From Swiss-Prot:
Source domain of life: Bacteria
Subunit composition and interactions: Forms a cylinder of 14 subunits composed of two heptameric rings stacked back-to-back. Interacts with the co-chaperonin GroES.
The protein's Enzyme Commission number: 5.6.1.7
Catalysis performed (reactions): ATP + H2O + a folded polypeptide = ADP + phosphate + an unfolded polypeptide
Function: Together with its co-chaperonin GroES, plays an essential role in assisting protein folding. The GroEL-GroES system forms a nano-cage that allows encapsulation of the non-native substrate proteins and provides a physical environment optimized to promote and accelerate protein folding.
Name of this protein: Chaperonin GroEL
Protein family (similarity comment): Belongs to the chaperonin (HSP60) family.
Cellular location(s): Cytoplasm
Amino acid sequence: MAAKEVVFGNDARVKMLAGVNILANAVKVTLGPKGRNVVLDKSFGSPLITKDGVSVAKEIELEDKFENMGAQMVKEVASKANDAAGDGTTTATVLAQAIVTEGLKAVAAGMNPMDLKRGIDKAVAAAVIELKNLSQDCADSKAIAQVGTISANSDESIGEIIATAMEKVGKEGVITVEEGQALENELDVVEGMQFDRGYLSPYFINKPETGSVELDHPFVLLVDKKISNIRELLPILEGLAKTGKPLLIVAEDVEGEALATLVVNNMRGIVKVAAVKAPGFGDRRKAMLQDVAILTGGTVIAEEIGLELEKATLEDLGTAKRVVITKDNTTIIDGNGEQAQIEARVSQIKQQIEESTSDYDKEKLQERMAKLAGGVAVIKVGAATEVEMKEKKARVEDALHATRAAVEEGVVPGGGVALVRVASKIADVEVANEDQKHGVVIALRAMEAPLRQIATNAGEEASVVANTVKNGSGNYGYNAGNDTYGDMLEMGILDPTKVTRSALQFAASIAGLMITTEAMVAELPKADAPDMGGMGGMGGMGGMM
């Protein structure tokens, strides 16, 4: 085991604070509408330019082991805030730095670190309750666009495209962000349920100009097995021929004689039919077939529940307004399933998402829920260069997380105002002693830090701005974008409650632990092995006789 270096007391805290400051100072220049960019060197490819706090934090690794520990702990604050709410990473870092700086001053002055931490925790718990009281619902499109705009560093086009996407696919819908080909941002919306399986034979195509199959008001047959014998399908096909309606078959596979017969019947115009493979594999396929059944009002024909294909009737089939099948995808539009059953299925999937521990499973369940609830929107980010593309895509993703958080827990006035208002209401939290009271004061001072940093980044005097805002009331705050004061909600400067709450809780949690640190242990740097000295030159040989 390698030898370790141990640092105690104030020496340890000073080193830790130095690391905290290096990381936080690099991150906090990005805060607010007039925040600056940070350029990150990459070992390959072009440098990355970003205004995303967590991206900056993740890049920082310090040479001094003890300073690095401080930096890594603040990095943890940013990462946790990012995981919980998807935004607010810079705010969390600024709060953590403020609490640690003030806290360590108090410890150096002889106060009890544990009591300071308890005071900070009490203040934060009270602040979270006040934030919830201050919060307002974020229901309309305008508010969603404003939240998106603020999170995307005042880029209105991003806020608007996210609001449009949410309007089209609903609050539960899936919105994904991709790199686009154009210079401008684009929005693609797939309405209805789409899954990544195309037609089993090109002979089903009835729209040669688009190379797709379109079925109007079709029946939908769902089978959880391979179909290779046409005899199994005859009763359904005969019943269908009488109605004159088209049929979509979704099965594990349709092959051999069954597929050939379907193709021939389709080409002769006897029955208009198309077949696709069921989406997913194993248990996920069963679940997705059941989703389609609920969406279309049909029944999955599966032998494990005692249903046989030969005995199926038109009653077992689902129906939809329209189905479009391309080489790679099948889209079912306006299934005729019962709304109550669809809603029950959505809430069942929601429950599974909450219980799931795997990110992959969560993502797949989220997709299934979106397909049932309304559809999928894809935001294609446009930019002139790859460097700009990366920076813009990160901002769009941040804005998307922020709007989701706003829909979930509501919004509070932005620009650091919410924390200032909350601080004024919790000054008289009950505490057990003077040191705890000072812990509360540390937390209250820290709650001003984001507002002060926004003002500093805008080139204003932080103390003047902070006092002006503190003397106001309600939503009155400072708009750094155009250097004016006024009602933050009316000016459209909103922060999601969840983002502000998460930033405060994670910052206080980790900063509290740092204040109570008394010793730090790190490996000693390995001394380099000495070089082998150069071998002396061999003497010249004497003259030989």
